[in-house]
């Protein structure tokens, strides 16, 4: 066996020996969450967009094991002002605080806060600027949902 092949196989053997299991495998953490999480009902457009992405990634459920509570905050920052004093670019900053409750035990299984941002340009028309802002909101909620799911899979104390 060549040295290259040996160096390629060695890490795989080490991973299996230490009890490594893929998070999306049959015994992985992500499997416990799939179609088992009920996201609280959204109250705002951002809440709807975040809930939609979470349900797309985790699946919708009729008999949930977990409840996911969310609090979303967003702020708008000015990034660029032209010589006339008009704002040309905005930064949309968002954060989501989440709490995952196990309905069977009543315990908080995971909680945390995720932050991210996205930007958009203010063009010459109001309609185009509003469309860009709505697209930025959608992108931001997708990013926050993906961060929440990543954190849940990585840190939640979930039953196997």
Show where each model-derived region lies:
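Sec-exported extracytoplasmic/periplasmic mature domains
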Residues: 55, 59, 145, 149-157
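Post-signal peptide N-terminal segment of mature Sec-exported envelope proteins
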Residues: 28-51
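Amphipathic, coiled-coil-like alpha-helical scaffolding segments used for oligomerization/assembly
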Residues: 136, 140, 151-160
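Bacterial signal peptide processing site
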Residues: 19-22
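Bacterial N-terminal signal peptides that target proteins for export
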Residues: 1-7
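C-terminal motif of bacterial Sec signal peptides marking the signal peptidase cleavage site
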Residues: 14-17
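Surface-exposed short loop/turn segments
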Residues: 64-113, 117-135, 142, 146
């Amino acid at each position: 066996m060549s040295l290259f092949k040996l160096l390629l196989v060695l890490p795989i053997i080490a991973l299996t020996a230490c009890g490594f299991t893929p998070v999306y495998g049959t015994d992985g953490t992500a499997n416990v969450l799939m179609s088992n999480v009920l996201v609280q009902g959204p109250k705002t457009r951002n809440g709807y967009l975040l809930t939609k992405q979470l349900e797309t990634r985790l699946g919708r459920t009729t008999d949930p094991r977990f409840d996911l509570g969310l609090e979303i905050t967003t702020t708008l920052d000015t990034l660029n002002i032209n010589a006339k004093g008009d704002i040309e670019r905005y930064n949309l900053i968002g954060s989501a605080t989440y709490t995952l409750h196990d309905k069977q035990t009543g315990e908080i299984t995971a909680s945390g806060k995720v932050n991210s941002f996205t930007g958009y340009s203010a063009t010459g028309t109001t309609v185009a600027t509003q469309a860009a802002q709505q697209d930025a909101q959608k992108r931001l909620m997708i990013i926050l949902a993906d961060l929440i799911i990543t954190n849940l899979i990585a840190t939640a104390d979930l039953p196997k």
